[in-house]
């Protein structure tokens, strides 16, 4: 029987950098933008990047994407159940 090969999803050039925010960072993010956590865009817990990070529903991810004009920009996603 074939075994499943491990693949580092973050090694792929098209996958942006992801990280889980701490509770303190999440509070600061919500305060800075004057929003509720429910107003953040969502990402499913089954997303390959979420699974690779080990994030769980309720966690907030910071995603760093490349930009031709700004260099990098950050966006945030709330991990939700499927």
Swiss-Prot record:
<dbReference type="GO" id="GO:0003677">
    <property type="term" value="F:DNA binding"/>
</dbReference>
<dbReference type="InterPro" id="IPR035913">
    <property type="entry name" value="RPB5-like_sf"/>
</dbReference>
<dbReference type="GO" id="GO:0000428">
    <property type="term" value="C:DNA-directed RNA polymerase complex"/>
</dbReference>
<comment type="similarity">
    <text>Belongs to the archaeal Rpo5/eukaryotic RPB5 RNA polymerase subunit family.</text>
</comment>
<comment type="function">
    <text>DNA-dependent RNA polymerase (RNAP) catalyzes the transcription of DNA into RNA using the four ribonucleoside triphosphates as substrates.</text>
</comment>
<dbReference type="Pfam" id="PF01191">
    <property type="entry name" value="RNA_pol_Rpb5_C"/>
</dbReference>
<keyword id="KW-0963">Cytoplasm</keyword>
<comment type="subunit">
    <text>Part of the RNA polymerase complex.</text>
</comment>
<dbReference type="GO" id="GO:0006366">
    <property type="term" value="P:transcription by RNA polymerase II"/>
</dbReference>
<protein>
    <recommendedName>
        <fullName>DNA-directed RNA polymerase subunit Rpo5</fullName>
        <ecNumber>2.7.7.6</ecNumber>
    </recommendedName>
</protein>
<dbReference type="InterPro" id="IPR000783">
    <property type="entry name" value="RNA_pol_subH/Rpb5_C"/>
</dbReference>
<keyword id="KW-0804">Transcription</keyword>
<dbReference type="GO" id="GO:0005737">
    <property type="term" value="C:cytoplasm"/>
</dbReference>
<dbReference type="GO" id="GO:0042797">
    <property type="term" value="P:tRNA transcription by RNA polymerase III"/>
</dbReference>
<dbReference type="GO" id="GO:0003899">
    <property type="term" value="F:DNA-directed RNA polymerase activity"/>
</dbReference>
<dbReference type="InterPro" id="IPR020608">
    <property type="entry name" value="RNA_pol_subH/Rpb5_CS"/>
</dbReference>
<dbReference type="InterPro" id="IPR014381">
    <property type="entry name" value="Arch_Rpo5/euc_Rpb5"/>
</dbReference>
<keyword id="KW-0240">DNA-directed RNA polymerase</keyword>
<keyword id="KW-0548">Nucleotidyltransferase</keyword>
<dbReference type="GO" id="GO:0006362">
    <property type="term" value="P:transcription elongation by RNA polymerase I"/>
</dbReference>
<keyword id="KW-0808">Transferase</keyword>
